[in-house]
Amino acid sequence: KGTMYNSGCKIDIIDTQKKMGDLFVHTGKIKKGTINIGQSVNLEIDLEKRNNSKANHSATHLLHESLRRTLGKHVTQKGSLVSPERLRFDFSHNKPIEKEEMSKINKIVNEVVESSTDVQTRIMTPKEAIKMGALALFGEKYGEEVRVVFMGKESNGFFSTELCGGTHVKNTKEVGKFKIISQSSIASGVRRVEALRDKQLTEHENSQEKDRTLKEKTNKEQLEKIKKEILSYKIKPDLSENKDLVENLKNLNKQLEKIKIQNVIKDKNKNKIKDKKISDFIIREQVLSDFPPKELRSVIDQGKKDIKKGIII
C-alpha cells in the first residue's frame, strides 16, 4: 500500500498482487486529477503499513510452525490473510484449540520473537527446498527456482522453514509481542485463528481492560440496586463470599425474581381469583399482574392442588 503520483494525478494504492509470474497489478483509487496510458509516475510506499504487513507476515510463519508443534504435523495451511492491522490463519484441525494449547502456541511464537535472530532467505530448486524440510502449499505451482524463508535458529537448524516470495522482517524481534485473540470453525476439519501483535495488540488489550472495568462497575451498581430492592421486602439478600461478582449478581436476580413472584401471588390486587362452582366442578378465572409468563406453570400446578376437578382460565 502507498501512493502513485505525478504532476497531474494522485492515486492511493490499496492492494498489490503478483500475477502470471512477474506481473505486478496495483489496485488504487484516484484522489486527484487524471492518468493516461504511457505516463510516468512515482511510487511511494506507506512505510508504517509496509512494516506492519511484514511483521504480520513473519508472525504467520511462526504461528504455522507453532501450531504444528503443539497440535500435530497434520496441521497444514488452508488459507491466510495478512494486513497491516492483523493476521488470520486457516488450518486443518478437527476440534477447538484448548486453553492450555493456546497458551503454549502463543508462548512458542513469543520465545522465537524474543530470541532476536536474523531472518534468512535463500534461492534454490523446489526439490532442494523440500529436502531441507521446507513447507510448501499443496496445489501451488512453483517455478524452477523458489525462495525459502528461514526463521529462528535451533541447534539442528531453524524453527521455521517455508517456501515464500513475500516480504518479511529482517530480525524476529521486529514482530513484537504476539497473541491469538480468537478461534472459530469455518468448515469441517478447518479452524481459523486471528491474531494481533505489537501496537495493535496493546491497543486491543487496553480496550478489553477498559471494557472489563466498565462492566465490573456496572455489575457492582446493579448488585447494590438488587440488594436494596430485596431489602425493601424485609428479606436479607443471600450472598456467597466464595462466588465472584457475576455469579452473585445472577443469584440475587434469581432471589429477587422468586420474591416478586411470591408477593404477586399474595397480593389480592395483582392476583385476582374468581371461582364459579357448578355441582362438583369448579371454573377458576385468575388474572395475574406483573407476573413472568415462564412461571405460569407453577401457578397452574398450585391451582390443580386447590381444585381437584375443574378448569383454570
Residue ranges and their predicted role:
Residues 10-11, 74, 172-177, 181-313:
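Terminal appendage regions of diverse proteins
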Residues 25-29, 43-49, 86-96, 195, ...:
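Short, hydrophobic beta-strand segments
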Residues 84-186, 195:
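Non-catalytic interaction/regulatory segments
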